[in-house]
């Protein structure tokens, strides 16, 4: 969206959607089984990079639930910090930075294992309540590459759809076993917990179709964050031909 709005002619075009909600979680320093967003009032939370979707989604959720983002914690404002790089947020939190942080899996599970943090809420579930589904993760390529490699992209999308269909029926243990070669520092039980969490929040798409409704939800979040001057044209940055063909032909 950013590159498209800059006027670059060879901008990226989305052709398949992978996840339909934010995959991050709010992490506290202690177990909080009765956590609500009100618990963030007057607190610091590590939110990620300015202009990034994780931060924008978190701030959108807070605003839509009546919280005020700012640095006046005595007045109950939530101080969403953007000064800690995304890749070191968990380590910074373990080192004492912030009262809360956000984390994706498997980082959240690792923090619980190390007792440096405890997952208390899903940003994805909270954002779905106020914005609906959003195209959080999608596959894209440049206009030129797409025009020259339609067969390759179609075969890739077909394979993705097969994987999505398999994930619908596979058990958490089966999915975790398939993931394990890529996460060899995590136990199978930890990976099962990761899969369970993402199943519970319904994060994964059942098919690769990238809808206009979901793009509009993301655009609203970006506009609320002040990061978007104009909305992109859906048909310019999304091509659904590959997804539709995959859904028609892959059995």
What role is predicted for each listed range?
Residues 216-251:
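Conserved C-terminal helix/tail region of periplasmic/extracytoplasmic solute-binding proteins
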Residues 1, 59, 109, 161, ...:
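Predominant activation on well-ordered alpha-helical scaffold segments within soluble catalytic domains
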Residues 1-83, 92-95, 99-105, 120-122, ...:
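Short, glycine-/small- and polar/acidic-enriched structural segments
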Residues 70-72, 125-132, 200-212:
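Short, solvent-exposed loop/beta-turn-alpha elements that line the ligand-binding surface or hinge
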Residues 146-229:
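Secondary-structure end/capping motifs
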Residues 7, 85-182:
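Pocket-lining segment of extracytoplasmic ligand-binding domains
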